[in-house]
Amino acid sequence: MSRLAKINWNDATNGNGVCVSIFLQGCPHHCPGCFNQETWNPAGGQPIDFPDFIRQLIDKIQENGIERGLSFLGGEPLVSYNLEFVDKVITIIKAIYPSTPVYIWTGDIFENHLKDAESNSVLRHILSLTDVLIDGPYQQDKRDITLYLRGSSNQRVIDVQASLRTGETVCLV
């Protein structure tokens, strides 16, 4: 069961424009130098009251006429115990606001998620609704704070929909 580390309702850092950034608990990667080590423990953070959470999210996603993106960070949003929550949130938001861009940060590699999605319908569905995926573990020796949406140069910014259409990993930068 997913647990919430924090929510930033008006985040101008994690996505294009303004996004609602959802930081989930639990990360198996434990990258040295991680800026979010408090999210590693899957039992940390707060339990999520899903009906209340989704009501707030629906209200906030286009509050004051600002069309926000939806960003999932962590922790690790694509770890097994976070998949159901991420899938439910994306599915509901895309049903109401289909043009909402979805960003996901993962410490794993995109191609590994594609392989796992062959036998995991929830992960496959998440990827089918995701616009941009930032992949790869944070590597402290490759730290570069000038990079778009990334903390280290080994990480990639992937156009998920173009990648699924072409069968090749399509990087945006």
Task: Give the label of every model feature segment.
Residues N8, P137, Q161:
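Residues at the C-termini of beta-strands that transition into short coil/loop
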Residues I7, H30, F50-D52:
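N-terminal, charge-rich interaction modules
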Residues F85-K94, R143-V173:
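P-loop/Walker A phosphate-binding loop and immediately adjacent motor/lid segment at beta-alpha junctions
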Residues D59-G65:
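Phosphate/pyrophosphate-binding loops at sites that engage ATP/ADP/AMP, CoA/4′-phosphopantetheine
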Residues N36-P51, G65-S80, S99-D116, L127-D141, ...:
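Core AdoMet radical
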Residues M1-F23, P28, N36-A43, T169-V170:
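N-terminal [4Fe-4S]-dependent radical SAM core
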Residues F53-L57, F85-I93, V122-I126:
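A general structural detector for well-ordered alpha-helical segments in enzyme core domains, enriched
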